[in-house]
């Protein structure tokens, strides 16, 4: 059996950088406004994984009203959510992430993001795709007011599990 989930996240720029996207620190003059570390890619991916298993969303599992998640490392949140997936007998088939930002440019960091995500999901790097695009200067991302991200996850039932 397979399951598919979709996730979306957005954060506005504010304060000072660097920013963390896909688990990778990216030098930038602005930071991201967030309760946790503001990693839109890992937040969208976490939502996609949780959605695929009908486990709600990142806000349900890690509420922003809970002080323990203030400034939280999104890699830790992703690993915790993924453990819930493994506990239900599923594993990653593949994930596909689209980062939407006018700036900063993501291309130099994409391979590192793929490596980090593959490590956290205990899968091969070939099962992780990360890409970036702009909105051609349209909307809030086009005006460099923030970053958005979408993610899709395909989960596969592990063999030998019920």
From Swiss-Prot:
The record marks 35, 134 as: Transition state stabilizer. Binds 1 divalent metal cation per subunit. The keyword Aminoacyl-tRNA synthetase does not apply. The keyword Lyase applies. 4-CDP-2-C-methyl-D-erythritol 2-phosphate binds at residues 9-11, 35-36, 57-59, 62-66, 133-136, 140, 143. Pathway: Isoprenoid biosynthesis; isopentenyl diphosphate biosynthesis via DXP pathway; isopentenyl diphosphate from 1-deoxy-D-xylulose 5-phosphate: step 4/6. Gene3D superfamilies: 2-C-methyl-D-erythritol 2,4-cyclodiphosphate synthase (3.30.1330.50). Keywords: Isoprene biosynthesis, Lyase, Metal-binding. This is 2-C-methyl-D-erythritol 2,4-cyclodiphosphate synthase. It comes from Histophilus somni (strain 129Pt). The lineage of its organism: Bacteria, Pseudomonadati, Pseudomonadota, Gammaproteobacteria, Pasteurellales.
